[in-house]
Amino acid sequence: MILDTDYITEDGKPVIRVFKKENGEFKIEYDRNFEPYFYALLKDDSAIEEVKKITAKRHGTVVKVKRAEKVKKKFLGRPIEVWKLYFTHPQDVPAIRDKIREHPAVIDIYEYDIPFAKRYLIDKGLIPMEGDEKLKMLAFDIETLYHEGEEFAEGPILMISYADEEGARVITWKKVDLPYVDVVSTEKEMIKRFLRVVKEKDPDVLITYNGDNFDFAYLKRRSEKLGVKFILGRDGSEPKIQRMGDRFAVEVKGRIHFDLYPVIRRTINLPTYTLEAVYEAIFGKPKEKVYAEEIATAWETGEGLERVARYSMEDAKVTFELGKEFFPMEAQLSRLIGQSLWDVSRSSTGNLVEWFLLRKAYERNELAPNKPDERELARRRQSYAGGYVKEPERGLWNNIVYLDFRSLYPSIIITHNVSPDTLNREGCKEYDVAPQVGHKFCKDFPGFIPSLLGDLLEERQKIKRKMRATIDPVEKKLLDYRQRAIKILANSILPDEWLPLLVNGRLKLVRIGDFVDNTMKKGQPLENDGTEVLEVSGIEAISFNRKTKIAEIKPVKALIRHRYRGKVYDIKLSSGRNIKVTEGHSLFAFRDGELVEVTGGEIKPGDFIAVPRRVNLPERHERINLIEILLGLPPEETSDIVLTIPVKGRKNFFKGMLRTLRWIFEEEQRPRTARRYLEHLQKLGYVKLMKRAYEIVNKEALRNYRKLYEVLAERVKYNGNKREYLVHFNDLRNEIKFMPDEELEEWKVGTLNGFRMEPFIEVGEDFAKLLGYYVSEGYARKQRNQKNGWSYSVKIYNNDQRVLDDMEKLASKFFGRVRRGKNYVEISRKMAYVLFESLCGTLAENKRVPEVIFTSPESVRWAFFEGYFIGDGDLHPSKRVRLSTKSEELVNGLVVLLNSLGISAIKIRFDSGVYRVLVNEELPFLGNRKRKNAYYSHVIPKEILEETFGKQFQKNMSPAKLNEKVEKGELDAGKARRIAWLLEGDIVLDRVEKVTVEDYEGYVYDLSVEENENFLAGFGMLYAHNSYYGYYGYAKARWYCRECAESVTAWGRSYIETTIREIEEKFGFKVLYADSVAGNTEVIIRRNGKVEFVPIEKLFQRVDYRIGEKEYCALEGVEALTLDNRGRLVWRKVPYIMRHKTNKKIYRVWFTNSWYLDVTEDHSLIGYLNTSKVKSEKPLKERLVEVKPRELGEKVKSLITLNRAIARSIKANPIAVRLWELIGLLVGDGNWGGHSKWAKYYVGLSCGLDKAEIEEKVLRPLKEAGIISNYYGKSKKGDVSILSKWLAGFMVKYFKDENGNKRIPSFMFNLPREYIEAFLRGLFSADGTVSLRRGIPEIRLTSVNRELSNEVRKLLWLVGVSNSMFTETTPNKYLGNESGTRSIHVRIKNKHRFAKRIGFLLDRKATKLSDNLREHTNKKMAYRYDFDLVYPKKIEEINYDRYVYDIEVEGTHRFFANGILVHNTDGFFATIPGADAETVKKKAMEFLKYINAKLPGLLELEYEGFYVRGFFVTKKKYAVIDEEGKITTRGLEIVRRDWSEIAKETQARVLEAILKHGDVEEAVRIVKEVTEKLSKYEVPPEKLVIHEQITRDLKDYKATGPHVAVAKRLAARGIKIRPGTVISYIVLKGSGRIGDRAIPFDEFDPAKHKYDAEYYIENQVLPAVERILRAFGYRKEDLRYQKTKQVGLGAWLKVKGKK
């Protein structure tokens, strides 16, 4: 490994020294043959002899060209011949170069300013820091005696501290009694001791913090004064101090002096860079500061020296820790740039790029351009035409479509080959000519800059052209993946990055390279030109919705792999998150209120990157199958594993079953006991019994089951001692997969002579907590015993006896008897070893979060985390939770787990081989309080707050605090809405701390993720996206080209102009309202985790704000059930509900005579196109179309209703199932309540002919379980009285309303699926019917109770059974007379799911249902998804004069209204006059296709939004209002916190008048009215109060604003004023300074005070509106109240587009 290079002089000649570490030893290699040189371009080669005669003097020595040779090079891509001039010594070059340049025959000289040692590295292709050598590091720090006014190094050094891997020590020359302090006699002896320490320890790296400018210089000066030779170099030299700009830099020969200060200044943005501040920012831990005066006092008095020594020791220790943190990144940068770490760590970003390009130029035989002289620099900095700005016509505009180019300028650089070496190049066959400026760029070869940035992206466009030309769909797909992969070559991530994926529903943490490589081995990837693409299914990634910022699970469509050679960027965030990406791969950064894609090449320290606040993982009750785990082990590992089952009830079972199976397959005669086995097979679902026969339901499954019993019958053995059957696992290894779970549950599994356990473990809170204990402080061991066999042990450690008690209890619960030691619990069971090893790993370095934990219910995940924390966590003194582990996989697993629990406030650190995860949030099982003001990614950074609100903030702020301030009016709500996604979404921001660049050659990888095209990846989890960003130089760079920059901008203008011209000529948009649904429409929501069916009007609880005639109510914690584009039912956030009165037509859409939906004429429903309109292979989203009520029957014939279970699923308690079946029977055919004594204790049930069956299946099990006391037959045959006091009370309380009618309580909507199904089973068994109508199976529930029927429908939807409802038109009759009721039928649509999940208790109904469905199959394609279809029967206009409502559903913009999927608009649609909404959308998409087909290369236009109305001052100063009524302003002064209420209110009214009402004159009238009222003192003083905050100590204010003046007067009265105090004041009329006239508002007395009307008009109201109205030609004086009438500007202000 090369550490550094330099040169020395021997006999007047340079000798290159290469300092290396090789095989653990330091060595110096010498090269005496390398010569200094530069290049000269001559007018005539004959002049070379004259040039060789040129001389100059250097320190009395004559300097001249030693020799010259002619060489062929390229200059800006053009062939050129230059002379390479060699010299004797490197110092000859600066001495003679100007004289050579001035010779008339010399055109110019080149590469004369590259230092000799750096030139050597470039020319020889040597890369510093390359290799795997382990470097020894030593950090040191000094403490000095300083009194104010003393000269530098006048005072002595008091202490020298140093730290390395062995620890930290302090050397001093006063007695300090501490174990890490070495005391010597004098300062001189102390310095000598330190020099001896360095010599003995012989570190490769010396780490300092500002050692360049303090420590080394101070030591050197004191050493000189004391007569000590300050030898630190490995060559026996003293440190070399040299000037570097306005700072110094210190070299120690043979060692790398790594000064952290310039590195940290370049990497991290901090308000102060003290060692203490940096340490806390990096590691999240405070460090004590001892000030110079305190050190001096302690030294001179002898008191407190221990504190100083401890501080000195900690300085060295902290410097060492920081060095270890930053050194690897600087080493990677050194490898990439190809220069020494000493140089790289002290270089600016611009210099690093220069050195990188210089090396690349040498590799390509390119002559590097010279740096610009002052004249050239001035030329480069001259202005040129900027980007396109269309000066808008004054006035107000309607219907604004916003179109934008993605990455416009980088795309132009690559598309048009813009580069200095292609500029105006003669002799090319093809040029791209920049419009307007006329610069030509050769297209015959790739330019130097574009080729470094985007060679592969050019290839992508060729493939797109091939795609358009080919008609072969396979080739087209392959080419499509190829062009994606080519894009990804510059936009991919490296193989070692972590990636969480859901594979077949189970979350796995994988390295992306390993996962893609292994998956591709099993599949058949498509390959073209080295790009491999494998289409996959069953794999999902964690991503986020770009619009809503909500985390989503999205399918991975393909895995992509390609070889790559180029730059990679190592991006480290302040939380410790980290990812390596290729140059063009994007992360998501905060820019101007939004998240945008920013590439690795563009990301800089201080950027804020998107990381997850929460990830929404699927939840289910997990169950571990031990058999599956055992099957994953080799046979030798399971040779002693057996399965056992009790004999009771199974005598001769295995042989009897085998004989029966052979008989079924007609190989033997019918056994006498066949009925017994047939009944068992029927329970397993293999056969169906009839009165005199049976029917095979699944022949293939039965055949496999027989294979199992062939082995079982032969291999099973009888163990008489334990009265059990036993079979060796290995005997069943190949067939056990055929054993049904119902049978497997009855077996136990374990070792032959040891412990056995049930084969399934339910992952509940107890087991999860035990796993957490193990992962934190447990290990699993397998070792040889004395009998040469194997012993297995699992030990979990803890020193807290209460914790050990809990561990023992939990371990005993699952594994029987355990052993308790002093500080551990031991489970000596092989099955425990197998289980823990497979789920969690064994050693500290390979531990992991078990996969089953991630997808378990939230309470289970918390239980695991609690166990882990108790075992391996601690509560840091700063109140933060700290978790420690050596396992990188476990760290990432913990982060994903914490994110799934909604915790994002984490930091990850790595120290001494241990990862530490710090959590700064309150946890439910702890009483910790989060630490305030610490920067964690869950808070909103103050930089974001400042950008959003346009004012300074002292600290970061939590979303809750921000909301509180907005609600109080302290922060502007309109501005806050810009970052609403940051407050409410699943994204938080993490600051980029460091970006390191290096070279990489090998495979890079990417995923294609459906819809979102982003995924979670990297160490600590970041959101990554594939995109591209181009790089261009800066004005001082060698390769900068003013003509190139000018051309890129000109092309940008041209493309924007063309686009605008095209859209003006071909398209024109108008706006129409798109309204909502009626107030009594029921929507399905989940509020705070609970499912509700609520009338939409009930969601509207208050008016939070108004936009025009529309009223809005903000919602929190509310989600709506919706359907995504993949046909899945999902829950999505509802941020608000809107209502308004309408005069539009309201239509009632009837689906049956009892099921309808009321919508406005413009509201869209979601229709489903059948395969006659859209081919079946088309994506589902192309078949889901928006349709207006009057278009039903023409455009589409079917609408969508829900058809998938949304209730949670559990492992149900069998007795609880029976109880809910009974309750269902009671609601159907029961009676309860009343005032009799019987009613207090009994409920009645009419069973009819099914009494015996109901008793056997329901009543008897409930009696035996003690749920009911008893049951008795009544006088009427078939009736039963059930004795149960609690049940009688329960039924009265919950299942009858105040009128005594049966009902279903709302809590049932949140029961587990299994219990709802049990209730429905009982209900349908009582009141349901099964029939065949015209050959079609029919299942109905009949009632006369409409409310009950509606509630039953909701329960059916909850368990995934689609249904409808209709009412009989003929009234019911009783004894020949009309009863006044009509039968209401709930009709089952998805009959097969009903049969499978609900069915009937009664055999007669169950059999009839089975028979009816046997020949009836589900043919609906919709059943592949989570929905069913319904067909409107009738549409009619109705009278309706109340509010109509709409809800905003994030992501999908759809919700279920009365069970029908409808589209929620944001209030408005864009349209073309005379065309419907579908036409508008179609035309908009057609325009994008049209223009993008015309645009060359990578250029692509995107549809960014539609605005209802807006006005423009310049390109970057405008205000618009979108369809949601959201007002966006840019570049215009908007309300500030220090404005009074009158200013805020006036501005809001002005914007509303202009943007919502389209009336500028109204806006002007509003301002005049306010100024008039102010002038006449008619404005209430409450609206004039100004609130400003004191942000620092009063003594620190240099300027005294009104609030400071008031504060100082209050302080003078003894009122305490501290930073954070808000001063509320009002300005009074009078003369003098405003501060003198400002008084606290509570002292304002209207009887004796008058406010300063002129102040409020000029400094509050007019500034709030002036910039807005200036866009319409108004001046300040036009807006004030005037007694004489002013001529209006109405004609001029007429809204464009209005007739």
Curated annotation (Swiss-Prot):
The keyword RNA-binding does not apply. This protein undergoes a protein self splicing that involves a post-translational excision of the intervening region (intein) followed by peptide ligation. One of its GO terms (molecular function) is DNA-directed DNA polymerase activity. The keyword Nuclease applies. Keywords: Autocatalytic cleavage, DNA replication, DNA-binding, DNA-directed DNA polymerase, Endonuclease, Exonuclease, Hydrolase, Intron homing, Multifunctional enzyme, Nuclease, Nucleotidyltransferase, Protein splicing, Repeat, Transferase. GO terms for biological process: DNA-templated DNA replication; intein-mediated protein splicing; intron homing. Its EC number is 2.7.7.7, 3.1.-.-. Residues 770-903, 1222-1361 form the DOD-type homing endonuclease domain. It catalyses: DNA(n) + a 2'-deoxyribonucleoside 5'-triphosphate = DNA(n+1) + diphosphate. NCBIfam families: intein_Cterm, intein_Nterm, pol2. Belongs to the DNA polymerase type-B family. In addition to polymerase activity, this DNA polymerase exhibits 3' to 5' exonuclease activity. This is DNA polymerase. It comes from Thermococcus sp. (strain GE8). The gene is pol.
